Amino acid sequence: GKDSLSPRDQLTLEIARMLREDFLQQNAFMDVDSYSSFDRQLRLLALILHYEDLCRDAIAKNVELPALFAIPARERLGWAKYAAAEEYAANYQQVHDEMDSEIAALIEKAGEDA
């Protein structure tokens, strides 16, 4: 199963799932998600790809994959698409900054444990 894959391959599967569920999947019953501007879509995609880059760097520095998937900013990323139109830019930036700090803390902890 999935557990037999390398951490990098498991991350690829997780990013693919995020792209499918957090980026491509829409909820037509929610006004904020039934239509998104190009800028909003671009920023959300950039946020997911930034998470992937941070995770790949962290994996190279011996951070465990479950810890990367469990950061609070990861869950907030999944809910970011539901931010109101006038708030999404600030919301996305906040999630971006939280991802940076939370993953940096995991990298620092992995360095101390090594």
Q: What are these model-predicted stretches?
A:
Residues K2-A114:
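Conserved catalytic/coupling modules of large nucleotide/cofactor-utilizing molecular machines
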